[in-house]
Amino acid sequence: HTDAKLKVEVESHNLMDGAARGASEGVMLALNIGAVLMAFVALIYLVNQGSTALFGHSFTEIMGWMFRPFAWLMGIPAQDVAAVGQLLGTKTVVNEFVAYASMSDMIQAGTLSPRSVTIATYALCGFANPGSLGILIAGLSGLVPERRKEITQLGLKSLVAGTLAVFMTACIAGILG
């Protein structure tokens, strides 16, 4: 049995001071997150435009091609692999909201089978994208600035882990469906 001693530094002098400091720090954290999110969105746009200029295809489209084998492994029918791969690319490069909006258009057009819709719903349900990574880095770095290097080093790993986690869930949906 070990006794742990925790020393808490109190920076506030009373309830009103604590509330004011908390509100101030909260606003600064929100502004930091907003600024980093805008920077990441601008970076995504830059990469997509640069890729289109260099290769004739956006980075989102290229990622869609790269995700086709994953779509197939999840159990997506062959006729829908390209469309779902594109949705996965959109989710990974942009975000899940844009991907779900695209999937909604595909559902209304009748281009996706019900099985593909079910599996893709699970595969798109995650926050593994650059915008969310920016929020994570800004939020955690604002709370523990001395660990910023460690947080940024884990960023890419967290994207991969988050993507694989939702893909595994989609695989289970594919097996059960």
Where are these regions (language model features)?
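Membrane-interface elements of multi-pass transporters and channels
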Residues: H1, G50-H57, L143-R147, I175-L176
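Amphipathic alpha-helical interaction/coupling elements
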Residues: G18-G22, W65, L154
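Helix-boundary and loop/linker segments of multi-pass membrane transporters
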Residues: V8-V10, L73, A109-L112
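Long, contiguous bundles of hydrophobic transmembrane helices that form the permeation core
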Residues: H1-V27
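Conserved structured core elements
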Residues: H13, D17, I33, L37-V41, ...
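Transmembrane helical segments that form the transport core of multi-pass membrane transport proteins
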Residues: S24-Q108
